[in-house]
Amino acid sequence: YGRTARLERDTRLAVLPIGYGDGFPRGLSNRAQVELAGVRCPIVGRVCMDMCMVDVTDLPGVRPGDVATVYGPGLTEQDARLQDTIVYELLCALSPRVPRIYLEQGRPIS
């Protein structure tokens, strides 16, 4: 959308099902990263209404259905800095479409 990214090499992109319709800010377009298989992967192009794309060129083992961490340790703080805001504002903006998994002592409780 809008041709906001210019790729300098052959690139493999993954499409993530989260976008500004879910409360993931458009201001993170071409700026933020997500985590896949323990590796930070840059967002490429604009965050769309229901999706965003990330560069997984250097992760040949990534497959459809793999888990991507959008907000997590280090990532949420980084995104807040990029948006000139606080972590709580980002988390409060997430829509009900985004499932919540609550942890107690590192284990999911709901």
Sequence positions of predicted segments:
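Active-site anion/phosphate-binding pocket segments in diverse small-molecule metabolic enzymes
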Residues: Y1-S110
